[in-house]
Each structure stands twice: as C-alpha cells, then as structure tokens.
C-alpha cells in the first residue's frame, strides 16, 4: 500500500481548496446572475412604417441607452411587448377585474403613469452625451414629451379591440422578490427550519421589549413635523375624495400634502452618536452614498391596499440614518446606511386602522393594529408577522411617536404625544420619495440612490452570506420602495395588496 508523503498531502489539500474556491466562486456568480434586473421590452410594432413604428423604435432605443448607462429604474415591473406600461403589485391585482371598458382604461392609464414617472428619472440620470444622441434639439424636455406622446399613440392603437386587451391582461405580472434557484441550491426546506427558529427568538425578544408608553431615562433626539394641518379639513378630503373607475381614491397634490402633514409622526431616537441622527441621502465627491444629518428629511410615498372589499389609503414615512454601526468586525447586521418606513393605513373616516414599521432592508416588520381590527386566529403565512399592540389615540389630538433605540434603530416604543405641547425638538420637512430616484452625483451627472437591482450600493451586510438560501437578494441591504420582501420563510411583500385580509378581520369597535 502506497502512503502519500507530507508533500503530496499538502499538494492534494491545496488542489482541493482551489476546486472548492472555484465552485463557490461559480456559485456566487450564478446566484448573482439570477437576481432580478429590470427587463426592458419591445413593442410588436417595431419595424412598422409610420408614426407607430417610429414610436416603437424610440422606446427600444431609449431602453437600450438607459441599460447601457446603468440607469434603468427597477421600482416597477415591465409589461411584455408594451414598453409604455409598468405595473406594481397593487395595480397588478386588478387584472381579473377590468372587463368594463372604463375600468380597463383607468387601469392602463395608471400603468402608463408609472412608466412615464420612471422614465423621467431614467432620462434625468442619463449622461448628457446619451441625451444628445436621442434628442439633439430639445434634450431631456423633448424626451419627456416623446415618452408621453408615443405612449398615448401606441396605447390607443394597441387597445382598440377586446382581444388585444385580453392579451395584455395575461401579460401583466409583478415578480416576487425571491430567487427560486437560491432556494433550490441552498436546500431551502432545511435552511428554513433554522431561519424560523431565529425569527421566533426575535419575535419573543421584540415583544418583551416593546411598549406603548414613553421610554424612561433615554437620552434622545426628537424630530417633529415642520408643518401642521387641520383635522377637519383632512376628514373632508377623505370624505369627498373622487375615485377612478377602479375605485381607487384620487387626490390632488395639495390634498396629498395635507394628508401627509396630518399623520406625520414624531421620531424619537436614543442617541449615542451621529449614526442615530436622520438626514438626507447624498452621493459624496468620492462616489459613495452617505446621509447628511445636517438636513433631516422624512420622505413620503402614497400607496393603497385592499381590505374587506375596500381600497384604503396608506401613508408611508421613510427616514435614513448614516449607518447601523458595527459592534465588531464580525457583526453581520451592521454596515453603512440604515432606515425605517413607518406606514399608516386609514379608514374611510380618516381614523387609522393599522400602523406598521419595517426597516428599509425589509427586515424587522411589525404591525400595530388599532381596535377596529381583529387579528385572525390563524394568519396564513409560512412566517407569521409580528403583531404588537397599537396605542389608543385620537389623531386630532395626538402625534404618534416612533421611538427607536440607539445603533440598531429597532422600534421599542409607539406612544401618543399631545399636539398642543410639542416637545423640544428639531423640525423636519417632508419630501417626495421620488427625489431619491435621481440625486446629484457630480457637477453634471445624476444617479439614483438605488442600483438596477433596487439596492443601495454600499449597504450590503455580512448576513447575506448566511441567509442567501432564503432566496432574498442581499439580505440586510437597503432597498428601493416597492422591492421589499418582508419574510425569510415563505413569501411576503410589504406592498402585497391583500396582506391585511390575510392578517385581520374588521370589527365595529370605534
């Protein structure tokens, strides 16, 4: 029997290590390639003569230039063969409910509006050279106009008859935020057992540390809304709001602003350093993301959800911190950038039905139902959400205060604070979340805060090397609104239009 000497054993180990490293490297590349980049689509009218063919060609060239520049915006999802339409999960939920011509028109109008909005940011972020190649005369303004005009022209031609409308309906889909191949390669059924155990432990800890009373002996900084609004005027807005043919409320910009001012929270953060101050995301001169804490802002997103055969208005308030500081080099949760989304779901009378918080990574989701909601005895999710008590308050008389602990920015307290006696605090203005989709990048260029995967560059966490079998792309990384998976076990999204029906029943309690 031949016994390998020490030198041969070392050589074999080295070769084995190289093979393992190559396999792991190929696996990482493969898994990264499975992530969900925006998928531009081409109109079937490409190559036609006349205005329709010209417009189809225009969208194809615009998408090509946007892709080459790396500025494709991933907030919404494309509709195959209809480059002038995009869809989110809420709009996609009406796919089987638009037989009526008026409903179909309202539905397609909303999809076109999403596309026009996204393309405006993409055009803003295009390098000047690319813009000049697309429209050397009118520049970006000419491109905005052409997006609108060509979208109108193609939509009118594409949907004259019932059959093409049905064809489009079948192609409308909002992809989920889970990569199936990762779950296969990561032996998800086994991995999910360990993840479920960790989630259960976090739920227990979060329950025991949560309170609807103010924190005691905290050294904290408070931020209060810069502007106030009148409760009765807000109730009037909600009571008289018009609806489109889908039943979705339609608010003017001024009405939206009044709603956001009315329900804006007080932010209270236990402070130990600059990482506990909120601010404005910026691109630095070195081309990296940071948060300027000298300019505290709260970003707003208007959304809608479907509950008990109603369409409810949701107000999202998003803040950003410079970091979640690491406790050590091996801290898998710490890193650059952190943030929180606080959401209020309103009843038709303006009374909040549900408060929610989730970190901007999609992590640490918490629901705080008001008395008019009853938690279902069995919530039909593989990973049940954490449901906590909501404070009992009158929004006309009280702010909701969202109190977070230092460093982790976990929400530890949700409590009422009288509007007549505002605390010593720093005032914050509200800003449209869309601003983050096109930020100043250099002296002339602009860039979204988020890359084409919907992630904030530089916000990656070490936990992504542990939790990749869950199928979530870059767990712990900060994400663009509309791209938040909020569970590691099963599938659940922050903007799921039917999540409230799966979690709650409506009661008559006022």
Identify the residue ranges that each predicted region occupies.
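Short, aromatic- and cysteine-enriched interfacial helices/patches
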Residues: 3, 36-37
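Bacterial N-terminal signal peptides that target proteins for export
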Residues: 4-22
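Sec-dependent N-terminal signal peptides
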Residues: 23-28
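C-terminal motif of bacterial Sec signal peptides marking the signal peptidase cleavage site
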Residues: 32-33
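Domain-length functional cores that host ligand/cofactor binding and catalytic or interaction surfaces
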Residues: 37-234, 336-338, 349-510
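Charged, compositionally biased non-catalytic regions
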Residues: 219-292
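Short N-terminal edge-element motif at the start of the domain
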Residues: 277-355
